[in-house]
Amino acid sequence: MFKHSLVVLRVALCGALALSGLTAKGAGLTPLEQRWIAGMTPVLQHARTSGMPVDIVVQPQDAPDAAPLALGFKDGRCKFVLSLRGNPEGEATTQRLPAGLEDSALELMAAHELGHCRRYLEGAWFHLPAGFSATPVPEGLSPDLQRAYLSMKSVRREEGYGDLVALGWTAQRHPDQYAALHAWLMQERSRDLLPGSHHDTLTWIKLVRDPKALGSAPSMFDAALPVWQSGLNIDEE
């Protein structure tokens, strides 16, 4: 979700520990893995109650360069992939969780990934709304750089949608904590920011500084969609 955390597509799960249930105790997990899974559990329970096919996958090998949390999609199921072992960013992210709101922040992170899951399941990943016109690729780029540019923009749009879903969850489940968690997400997205890069989602986050901007739709996905579409137009200006 956060820095250096591109979404994992059709992740290779050989040797990984897959958890079909929501309990992490007694599964050979580290305390940090148990902590993250416990924090994400309300979102995972909501997903399963809603009929979304989700699993937790824990990578048992050291993964120093991986995103601590990412989403995989395999055999029609969404995989919440934890890569915390031998990964300094896992501990660093944990240390950056807002004091007193750690569980709610982990829920926000999980809801972000659930937004990706929803887009995969709908077959909408990297797809743009009808009528939306993206700006052309800058001139003078090689074919490889053109593909990289288009991929970067597509990832950023999906990350923006994921952030809006995450904030929609927060607005519905923890309204009294919304301002603090919104500020924390702004801070995370501003760390080492490269404007226009994969995780530059500030265009969308700024649109929902006031949670009322997310409307009153009962679904966090439906709440995110119109704001996401508005942000697409701003992002192209």
PLM features: what roles do these ranges have?
Residues L32-D55:
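Zn2+-dependent metallopeptidase catalytic core
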Residues A148-V155, L164-E237:
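Long, well-structured alpha-helical subdomains associated
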Residues A24-G26:
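Boundary at the C-terminal end of the N-terminal hydrophobic targeting segment
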